[in-house]
Amino acid sequence: MSNLTVLGGDPHRLGATITDNGVNFAIFSRDAVRVLICFFENYNSKTPYAVAELDPAKNRTGDIWHALIPEVKKGSLYLYRIDG
C-alpha cells in the first residue's frame, strides 16, 4: 500500500472537494472513534492501493472528520471505513 500525506483539511465543505492542493474530504459522524479513507485502482479492485487514517487530534472538529490529501486526484475511487 502506498503512503499518503494526510493534512488537517477543511471541515466546512462536506463531501470530497477538489482543491488546488489535492482533495479535501469531510464527513459527519457523531459516534466515530476511527476513520479511514480507502483508495482503489478501479471498480473491480478487492483491496485498496492506499489507506489514509485520520488523526482525531488534527482531523476532527466536533462531529466532522476532515482531511486534505495532496496525492489524491479527480476521479479517484474511495470509501470510508468508520469504527464507532
Predicted regions located by residue number:
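Non-catalytic, glycine-rich low-complexity segments
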Residues: 1-33
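Aromatic- and glycine-rich beta-strand/loop motifs that create alpha-glucan
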Residues: 30-75, 83-84
